[in-house]
Amino acid sequence: METFLFTSESVNEGHPDKLCDQISDAVLDACLAQDPDSKVACETCSKTNMVMVFGEITTKANVDYEKIVRDTCRTIGFVSDDVGLDADNCKVLVNIEQQSPDIAQGVHGHFTKRPEEIGAGDQGHMFGYATDETPELMPLSHVLATKLGARLTEVRKDGTCPWLRPDGKTQVTVEYYNDKGAMVPVRVHTVLISTQHDETVTNDEIAADLKEHVIKPVVPEKYLDEKTIFHLNPSGRFVIGGPHGDAGLTGRKIIIDTYGGWGAHGGGAFSGKDPTKVDRSGAYIVRQAAKSIVANGLARRCIVQVSYAIGVPDPLSVFVDSYGTGKIPDKEILKIVKENFDFRPGMITINLDLKRGGNDRFLKTAAYGHFGRDDPDFTWEIVKPLKWEKPQS
């Protein structure tokens, strides 16, 4: 059996880039909670002792940006300079303006347009991907890397591993078998974890705790064997972390947010963007389309692309590739997709309920992935029933 290796990585909520994603989405949530028609393009950057939020926001909401920044940093665990940022004493800079009137009239017609007439907020192309290798219909390498990161945060916050600090990265290499275009995981080849820690803990204690409390509960035993390689804090020391260790920026972790390197990516980031930004809403609807194709048995693995022009409601193109795993030809799958999914931005917003913010709805997406999550707020993960007829064999 010929196999190959494929690797995906993830980062924790305390990674400086992910901190920025979460602040941007916390701002989006706050705006949408008070004004569902808010137009938000919120970027965040961070470095030692400083967080800046900047961008274009048009909203009726009354939002305390500084409070959102401090609350988000504090919740993640940035409560002192020692851990990389002090939420209560860091500098917070805010530079937010209104959306450009040129963009507003082109996309929304200054709110005179009906939902089906609302144009795309920008040009671009987005991809959705699904694979039958996990219950989530997501790639195993990505699922495991993501869950290891989430578990690191869990054992830090519940006190299981009190030496942990907020920043950290994970990476998983899976050995795969290609079954006529479908991906079949055989085993986990390598697990890599680099986590921020305090001064008191030894490297041996770190390795033992990570194996027992992080890897064991996450990686199914059937994928581990005596040949699996573990790299646990291979650099030897990771005390300085968060924005103190590295600068952070919104939109720098787009592969971690999506499919871990599988499928394809159009390049647009998600966090801090309201649903008129097709970078986000377009990517959500094509994930629902790809997932529905696989869940309905039309294919074992599939990618869907959609593309847009600024100000134009209808997509310029829709593309489906089942990697040779389709039960019917791809052009017929494409026809089913076009009949069942409305790719106009205003209709995506309604059908996936994307104007509903608050209750950390979009903040939740900003760490540990936007796809494959079992949470009713992730409306794009709901499988649509697709009618099709199996060919007579």
From Swiss-Prot:
- Write down the required cofactor(s): Mn(2+); Mg(2+); Co(2+); K(+)
Q: Where do the annotations place ATP binding?
A: 15, 167-169, 235-238, 246, 252-253, 269, 273, 277
Name it.
Answer: S-adenosylmethionine synthase 2
| Annotated binding of L-methionine, by residue | 56, 99, 246, 277
Similarity-based family: Belongs to the AdoMet synthase family.
Listed under subunit, the entry gives: Homotetramer.
Q: Which UniProt keywords apply?
A: ATP-binding, Cobalt, Cytoplasm, Magnesium, Metal-binding, Nucleotide-binding, One-carbon metabolism, Potassium, Transferase
This molecule's function is given as: Catalyzes the formation of S-adenosylmethionine from methionine and ATP. The reaction comprises two steps that are both catalyzed by the same enzyme: formation of S-adenosylmethionine (AdoMet) and triphosphate, and subsequent hydrolysis of the triphosphate.
| Amino acids binding Mg(2+) | 9
Write out the pathway annotation from the protein's UniProt entry. Answer: Amino-acid biosynthesis; S-adenosyl-L-methionine biosynthesis; S-adenosyl-L-methionine from L-methionine: step 1/1
Binding note for cofactor: Binds 2 divalent ions per subunit. The metal ions interact primarily with the substrate. Can utilize magnesium, manganese or cobalt (in vitro).
